[in-house]
Amino acid sequence: MLQPKRTKYRKPHNVSYEGHTKGNGYVAFGEYGIVATKGNWIDARAIESARVAISKCLGKTGKMWIRIFPHMSKTKKPLEVRMGSGKGNPEFWVAVVKKGTVMFEVANIPEQQMIKALTRAGHKLPVTWKLMKREENS
């Protein structure tokens, strides 16, 4: 699963996923991409299961890009522990995905196969999504 090699702080403040993305709202590398239509935190397990779902549909010639990374740790206190006495320990890693963020991209396979791969990956993610085709600017 994805997680950072090292971080500046073990327990960051919660980062909001409200609002629209800045700069990651277009298909940059592949031909098709999957775009979040609402924001959410996506944990590393969901990203990994979506990656596996895409890679099973790609074959040998297909190419995939993961455009999100779980940089932020989420903390949790143990069960049956009273309130107070500090913040809990880091439990898992999440990527902050805002509305309009391109999460995965694929290329080098037939169009129907790309749509099928991204649709299967989208069902693994805890956000509402849509497919986006690359726009060629001439």
Swiss-Prot record:
The record's Gene Ontology cellular component field reads: cytosolic large ribosomal subunit
Q: Which PROSITE patterns match?
A: RIBOSOMAL_L16_1 (PS00586), RIBOSOMAL_L16_2 (PS00701)
Q: Does the keyword Transferase apply?
A: no
The answer on whether this UniProt entry bears the keyword NADP reads no
Q: Which GO terms describe its biological process?
A: translation
The Gene Ontology terms for molecular function here are: rRNA binding; structural constituent of ribosome; tRNA binding
Q: Which UniProt keywords apply?
A: Ribonucleoprotein, Ribosomal protein, RNA-binding, rRNA-binding, tRNA-binding
The protein's superkingdom reads: Bacteria
Pfam hit, one: Ribosomal_L16
Assembly state and interactors?
A: Part of the 50S ribosomal subunit.
Functional description taken from the UniProt entry: Binds 23S rRNA and is also seen to make contacts with the A and possibly P site tRNAs.
- PANTHER family from the UniProt entry: 50S/60S RIBOSOMAL PROTEIN L16, LARGE RIBOSOMAL SUBUNIT PROTEIN UL16M
**Assigned protein family:** Belongs to the universal ribosomal protein uL16 family.
Q: What is this protein called?
A: Large ribosomal subunit protein uL16
Which species is the source of this protein?
Answer: Mycoplasma genitalium (strain ATCC 33530 / DSM 19775 / NCTC 10195 / G37) (Mycoplasmoides genitalium)
